[in-house]
Design a protein with these regions (language model features):
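A short helix->beta-strand "capping" segment at the edge of beta-propeller domains
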Residues: 20-46, 316
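Beta-strand-rich domains and repeat architectures in extracellular enzymes and scaffolds
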Residues: 38-70, 273-285
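Structural signature of eukaryotic scaffold interfaces centered on beta-propeller domains
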Residues: 48-54, 100-104, 146-152, 198-208, ...
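Blade-loop segments of beta-propeller domains
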Residues: 80-107, 114, 135-140, 324-328
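Asp-box/WD-like beta-propeller blade repeats and closely related beta-sheet repeat scaffolds
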Residues: 115-117, 124-153, 159-160
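Short, conserved, GDST-rich strand-edge loop motifs in beta-rich repeat architectures
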Residues: 161, 275-303, 352
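Beta-propeller blade signature
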Residues: 169-174, 293-315
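Conserved blade-ending motifs and adjacent loop-strand segments that build the rim/top face
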Residues: 241-253, 316-333
Length: 358
């Protein structure tokens, strides 16, 4: 996930877009089931959180460790790193960004180096990990490549933005041929110039490779796409909470009392899971201001109550769980009720059992 810009708080309240029929944050969180995680033994010393996937061989994922390795395979019981690969750097089989976007296909890890436009592949070979320079992305125009998902070993889905701010979801093959692409725009508002919008997104593909979900942090919403016969088509868009904003020079500016969820999504065999840290825009701006005054980098996690929210594939709300830590990345298991979460504050993995979820 890449930060594309800063959120501006609106002081004036004219032209605020009030939509009818949206849920309030309380709808998702008021009846949340409280659960506690079981921490694994290993505590990581790293510059960023361990984003990983559950595989039969261990947790396979990425973080920048003390020895500047970025790809790691960790023990499923203890979380201890068993083997590492892929150095931070400019050379072959190295990565220029410390927190690349990740995707899992089979038991291989795909890493998108957004600074170098490279797709790297990390494979498990017995007791070792091997890194391959898989593909240098080039789609005919200068683009910033943000998110990656894997349809097959020869077909990728990329979320990208060109220099005019236009955001696209692109299917591309191993020869950089564009199979299909659609323009991404979450707000249906003729007054909004989407090319000027800057916000975080995350993109996840369902295990069956048929449905693609894109979440918008700023507007706390999720778009659902279908991939069929090489075509990408929009199926549905859901605003989880009401977005109140004013439009200034084509840019939607969130009203200070608006609640954003800081939502991140993960798609399992049966459900879509979302982590959420609900926060008022005014509180977020104050938190960022304090961080600047103290000369420190503000964390991505606000330190508020954290939740795991469960939806079905049609984005219908199922239930939510209030967790005992700042969960950042989820590693889903074959059991839909058992997940592992990366704790942002403690930088370790925790095992959670989602009560009453079958």
């Amino acid at each position: 996930m890449i930060m594309l810009g800063l959120l501006t708080v609106a002081s004036c309240k004219n032209e605020i877009k009030d939509k009818i029929g949206y849920k309030t944050p309380e709808f998702y969180f008021a009846d949340a089931i409280e659960i506690k995680g079981e921490p694994l033994d290993a505590e990581y010393v790293a510059s960023n959180v361990f984003k990983c996937f559950y595989t039969p061989y261990g947790f396979l994922g990425s973080m920048r460790s003390e020895d500047d390795k970025l790809a790691h395979l960790a023990d499923l019981k203890t979380g201890e790193i068993k083997v590492s690969a892929c150095s931070f750097g400019r050379g072959p089989e190295e990565i220029l960004i410390s927190s690349p976007d990740l995707a899992l296909y089979g038991n291989s890890l795909y890493m998108l180096d957004q600074r170098a436009d490279w797709i790297k592949k990390v494979e498990i070979h017995g007791d070792t990990l091997k890194t391959f320079d898989l593909q240098k992305l080039s789609l005919g125009e200068p683009m910033f490549f943000i998110e990656i998902q894997i349809v097959s070993d020869s077909l990728f889905v990329i979320f990208a933005e060109n220099f005019n701010g236009e955001k696209k979801i692109v299917q591309v093959d191993r020869d950089n041929n564009i199979v299909d692409s659609v323009v991404y725009s979450f707000l249906d508002d003729e007054n909004v110039d989407c090319g000027k919008c800057r916000y975080n997104v995350e993109m996840e593909l369902s295990p069956c490779k048929k449905y693609l979900y894109v979440s918008s942090h700023l507007f706390s919403g999720i778009s659902k796409y279908q991939i069929e016969d090489g075509k990408i088509s929009l199926v549905d868009k859901v605003m989880l909470v009401e977005p109140k904003y004013v439009v200034k020079n084509g840019i939607p500016v969130m009203e200070s009392e608006n609640v954003i969820l800081n939502n991140r999504i993960f798609v399992g065999e049966k459900y879509l899971y979302m982590t959420a840290d609900p926060e008022k825009v005014s509180d977020m701006k104050e938190r960022e201001k304090r961080a600047r005054e103290e000369g420190r980098r503000e964390s991505a996690a606000p330190g508020n109550d954290s939740y795991i929210v469960v939806f079905d594939y049609d984005l219908n709300f199922i239930k939510s769980y209030r967790v005992d830590s700042d969960v950042w990345h989820l590693a889903l298991t074959p059991d839909p009720s058992v997940i592992y979460a990366s704790d942002y504050r403690e930088n370790r993995l925790k095992r959670y059992v989602l009560a009453d979820l079958k």
